[in-house]
């Protein structure tokens, strides 16, 4: 009986390292910003709340915003073929993203650093490589809803809100993040059959 373990398939490449460094730099940016914007007498709890929500906003704007940018502005022309719909299309046959039947949109067709980041992510879930309408609709909500709300929470911390608005909006945002993540997870299970 052979008990030899198979070699690991974990690959740490340049894209992975740059992606992790990008996320770490956003966290460091949030921390340094807290040092400048919060009074030195701010409690540790409020400083952590500020850092967390600023980090959340930066993730929404920088990383998820780059996903939306790639979905709307990065594309490849579909060669004329008899394959209909095109095998790489993430939309129904009669649905053409942005009205172009001859284009496929998404990071899968880009060469920028952010496109490479999303190409890596798409290896685990192909919806993130193209223009999946459900993912785009969720990301529009996070970039234009959750991101600004996270900044508003940071502003309430900075002002020293005593009226309870801080905790109300922090609870609203946390609930939205939890439900959004769960919805996306369930949708992925429904489409792939994997849990």
Model-identified regions with their sequence ranges:
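Glycine/proline-rich loop-helix segments at beta-alpha junctions forming the active-site rim
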Residues: 155-178, 182
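Interhelical loop segments of eukaryotic multi-pass membrane proteins
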Residues: 2, 42-48, 68-122, 192-194
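Membrane-embedded alpha-helices of multi-pass membrane proteins, especially ion channels
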Residues: 23-39, 59-71, 149-156, 180-187
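Transmembrane alpha-helices of multi-pass eukaryotic membrane proteins
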Residues: 10-24, 44-63, 135-140, 164-173, ...
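Juxtamembrane membrane-interface segments at transmembrane-helix boundaries in membrane proteins
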Residues: 1-15, 90, 94, 117-136, ...
């Amino acid at each position: 009986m052979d008990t030899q373990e198979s070699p690991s398939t974990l690959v740490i490449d340049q894209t992975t390292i740059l992606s992790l460094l990008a996320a770490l730099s956003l966290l460091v940016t949030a921390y340094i910003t807290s040092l400048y914007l919060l009074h030195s007498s701010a409690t540790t709890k409020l400083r952590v709340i500020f850092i967390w929500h600023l980090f959340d906003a930066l993730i929404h704007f920088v990383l998820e915003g780059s996903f939306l940018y790639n979905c709307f502005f990065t594309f490849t022309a579909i060669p004329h073929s008899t394959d209909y719909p095109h095998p790489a299309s993430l939309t129904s046959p009669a649905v053409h993203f942005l009205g172009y039947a001859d284009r496929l949109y998404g990071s899968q067709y880009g060469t920028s650093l952010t496109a490479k980041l999303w190409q890596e992510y798409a290896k685990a879930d192909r919806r993130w490589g193209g223009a999946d309408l459900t993912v785009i609709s969720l990301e529009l909500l996070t970039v234009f809803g959750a991101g600004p709300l996270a900044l508003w929470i940071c502003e309430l911390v900075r002002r020293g809100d005593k009226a309870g608005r801080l905790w109300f909006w922090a609870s609203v945002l946390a609930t939205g993040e939890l439900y959004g993540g769960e919805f996306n997870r369930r949708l992925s299970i429904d489409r792939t059959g994997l849990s």
